[in-house]
């Protein structure tokens, strides 16, 4: 399910659920190489559709008599993430979230030098998606699709921390551990997002993603509580990644429990 390419200083986690077993996604340290630029485009496009679909469900629900409903909004977020993981996860890793990228880098599973470029691509995708929605729903139909705390700042911070911790813990489990059932990675990750939106949506808007909050905030010029959505998800994701590293413990070498090729390739080789 994940490509885990070893390097001298850091490794890159790439979600891979395709049937192409002849090629393995290789790490590229060059910031101007074609493969790396392809990854950036995949991250920008993936983040665009994640934010467009998720935030569109909020705006449409607000403008059209709650036809989507709150559970429907949660399902939209979960489904779009699931689809995107299977679509471009094997190209860029399917982060779509600066918190995920930073967390992987903190555990040396993603090249630190590539983090700024990934974050910029993710923010660009979010801003473009938010701008598209504002153009589509101008005038009386214009709705702020960002995230604002509905309780205290402390309550919102703790919720965002816990939800992002949970999301990152699941991502690490299905994307970096060779013992996981890789074909269900997208479903597991999307389902986790869906659950978090249902639980935390009424309290914080269930961001779990600095890009998800910053894009709409930038387009609408509304920054209430934005620091919560920039800080809490990053701290939560880093904590989730490190805790999974602790519970991953096995008597096998790390190289045998982290994925070195696609799940399907490893499975075929074992037959």
Curated annotation (Swiss-Prot):
Protein name: Nodulin-26
Biological process, per Gene Ontology: nodulation
Induction annotation: During nodulation in legume roots after Rhizobium infection.
Protein family: Belongs to the MIP/aquaporin (TC 1.A.8) family. NIP (TC 1.A.8.12) subfamily.
Motif NPA 1: positions: 97-99
Keyword set, alphabetical order: Membrane, Nodulation, Phosphoprotein, Repeat, Transmembrane, Transmembrane helix, Transport
Matches recorded under Pfam families: MIP
């Amino acid at each position: 399910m994940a490509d885990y390419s070893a390097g001298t200083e850091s490794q890159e986690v790439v979600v891979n659920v395709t049937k192409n077993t002849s090629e393995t996604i290789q790490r590229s340290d060059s910031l101007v190489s074609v493969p790396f630029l392809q990854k950036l485009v995949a991250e920008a496009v993936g983040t665009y559709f994640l934010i467009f679909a998720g935030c569109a469900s909020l705006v449409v629900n607000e403008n059209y008599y709650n036809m989507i409903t709150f559970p429907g909004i949660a399902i939209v977020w979960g489904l779009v993430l699931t689809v995107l993981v299977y679509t471009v996860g094997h190209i860029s890793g399917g982060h779509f979230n600066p918190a995920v990228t930073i967390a992987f880098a903190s555990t040396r599973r993603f090249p630190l030098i590539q983090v700024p470029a990934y974050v910029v691509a993710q923010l660009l995708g979010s801003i473009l998606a938010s701008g598209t929605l504002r153009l589509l729903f101008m005038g009386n139909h214009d709705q702020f699709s960002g995230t604002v705390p509905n309780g205290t700042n402390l309550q919102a911070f703790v919720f965002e921390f816990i939800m992002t911790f949970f999301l990152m813990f699941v991502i690490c489990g299905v994307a970096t551990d060779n013992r996981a059932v890789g074909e269900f990675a997208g479903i597991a990750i999307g389902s986790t997002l869906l659950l978090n939106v249902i639980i935390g949506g009424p309290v914080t808007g269930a961001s779990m993603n600095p890009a998800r909050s910053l894009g709409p905030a930038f387009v609408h010029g509304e920054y209430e509580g934005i620091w919560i959505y920039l800080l809490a998800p990053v701290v939560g994701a880093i904590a989730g990644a490190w805790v999974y590293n602790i519970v991953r413990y096995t008597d096998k070498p790390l190289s045998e429990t982290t994925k070195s090729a696609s799940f399907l390739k490893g499975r075929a080789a074992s037959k």
